[in-house]
Amino acid sequence: MKLADVINAIGGEAPDLDQALAGLDTMSFVIDSREVKTGDVFFALSQPEYADNGFNGDFDDSTRYAASALDAGAAAVVLRRDRFDEYALELAPHTGRLIYVDDAIAALQRLARAVYRMWGGKVVAVTVSAGKTTAKGLTAHVLAASGRKTLKNIKNYNNGLGHPLTVLKLAAEPEHDVAVLEMGMTKPIHEI
């Protein structure tokens, strides 16, 4: 998936994008700046997004780590356009690698939807009151033992952040035959 395709899929704007980056193949997407590797796209999540997307609690504004993610090799950073001003001093040298959106969590989810559609493989969705992680693990094990290349959620990443991060692994590993996805249900099924 080219960076230009990512920008289009998330409804982002990159007015100063370095055109050499537009054709860059992007395969890995992260929300933790400490995990950035060369070529990754870093999604900088902020407190308003967490609240707007139903996450309770106090979360760190990862926009403060956007410049360090770029210094660590990230190809680009996706951030809320209204967060730039607060971090303008650190981000100004990097404007050619910034992608602006209204909501970085929603953008991450839109990108996962686009990757899923491009992949087109089979999905086993696991959602129950208790035992999702165990059921996911057993199902993935049986499918893998039958010779199918199987993707499964990392740990118990089953919410509005973890689920998209798992699906986005298909951008780098499209050879999977099936994805076993554990999903915590906080919204009606038609909104997932």
Each model region followed by its residue ranges:
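N-terminal leader/targeting and accessory segments in enzymes
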Residues: 1-110
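Phosphate-binding loop of NTP-binding sites
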Residues: 107-192
